[in-house]
């Protein structure tokens, strides 16, 4: 029987705070990658689909990369650390510092910033939580993303105690203010796109989306350089898990159907995976507009909360799988 391959990634007990992983392949955002990403998720974000509109609004040539494609690639590049992941528990503090265009090349550095061993449970292999900080830059060194996530990783066979007991509750909780879309022309958007447009009266509204089947899950993971084994090999946990960004991507696609004039995603305040998703599930979301913040030049920022539910292909009760708070620009 072949021996386990260490290329899969480190065990929890092999990590130390301060460790850096920066050897993932850089990835150029191509039209082909954008097309496949859109085909899998069906997102209708206008600025990522319409180059004439995008150039008029951003004032620069070229088509912006879809923000979901950017985050998927950044997360995928960080899976050098989490090839053995059992579950990804949360994302925190994801902020766009700049918006790449198609043709830009992304690289991501991942740092271990906290480690906490889980309590050992009888009959279960020991695990621990690794808090990671990802910073993504483009080919010019411009900062694109800065965010944290928490992954549950197994411990190596025979390891009982690592001594890691960091408090992970505040990691990634600091608020960061950026304005990468500050120079965009909202009037140009409104002149070219029919309403409804941003209005302060949107605050407090709630919407139930239509549903989407989860399909092409391994393809999305491969596209985004995500090498976590649980997304590719059912033997890891008895059933292949869908990459969490796939669920997030479908939730964003549903948000763009509910609010078709969203311009872009500005950041994620929090994102908690509350249950597993499997290929063939059907997912839908309840979208809450929790707060609106008008901008001086028109338009505004929506603070949104998406609660996502899944229904198995075989039926059964609906189950909540995602609680995602994010901010979006609307003109």
Residue ranges and their predicted role:
Residues 1-19, 102-183, 279, 286-331:
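HotDog/MaoC-like acyl-thioester-processing domains
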Residues 12-15, 28-29, 64, 94, ...:
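Hydrophobic beta-strand core residues of beta-sandwich domains
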Residues 71, 91, 134, 185, ...:
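Aromatic/pi-system hotspot detector in well-structured domains
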Residues 55-65, 69-115, 247-290:
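Hydrophobic beta-strand-centered segment that forms part of the acyl-chain substrate-binding groove
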Residues 30, 63, 67, 213, ...:
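Hydrophobic alpha-helical segments and helix-packing faces
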Residues 237, 241, 266-268:
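A beta-strand-loop signature enriched in Asp, Gly, Thr, and Trp
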């Amino acid at each position: 029987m072949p021996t386990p391959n260490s290329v899969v990634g480190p065990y929890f007990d092999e990590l130390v705070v301060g460790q850096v992983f920066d050897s993932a392949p850089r990835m150029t955002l191509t039209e082909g990658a954008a097309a496949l990403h859109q085909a899998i998720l069906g997102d209708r974000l206008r600025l990522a689909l319409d180059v004439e509109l995008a150039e008029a609004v951003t004032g620069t040539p070229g088509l912006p990369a879809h923000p979901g494609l950017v985050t998927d690639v950044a997360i995928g590049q960080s899976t050098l650390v989490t090839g053995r992941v059992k579950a990804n528990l949360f994302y925190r503090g994801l902020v766009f510092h700049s918006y790449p265009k198609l043709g830009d090349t992304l690289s991501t550095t991942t740092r271990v910033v906290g480690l906490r061993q889980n309590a050992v449970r009888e009959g279960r292999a020991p695990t621990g939580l690794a808090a990671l900080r990802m910073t993504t830059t483009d080919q010019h060194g411009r900062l694109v993303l800065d965010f944290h996530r928490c992954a549950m990783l197994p411990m190596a066979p025979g390891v009982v105690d690592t001594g890691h007991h960091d408090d992970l509750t505040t990691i990634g909780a600091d608020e960061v203010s950026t304005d990468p879309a500050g120079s965009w022309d909202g009037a140009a958007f409104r002149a070219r796109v029919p309403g409804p447009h941003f209005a302060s009266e949107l605050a407090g509204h709630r919407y139930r989306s239509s549903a989407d089947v989860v399909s092409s899950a391994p393809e999305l993971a491969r596209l985004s350089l995500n090498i976590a084994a649980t997304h590719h090999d059912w033997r890891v946990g008895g059933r292949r898990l869908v990459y969490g960004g796939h669920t997030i991507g479908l939730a964003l696609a549903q948000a763009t159907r509910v609010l078709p004039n969203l311009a872009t995603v500005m950041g994620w305040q929090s994102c908690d995976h509350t249950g597993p998703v499997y290929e063939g599930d059907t997912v839908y979301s309840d979208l809450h507009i929790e707060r609106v913040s008008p901008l001086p030049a028109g338009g505004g920022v929506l603070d949104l909360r998406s609660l996502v539910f899944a229904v198995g292909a075989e039926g059964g009760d609906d189950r909540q799988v995602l609680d995602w708070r994010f901010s979006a620009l609307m003109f």
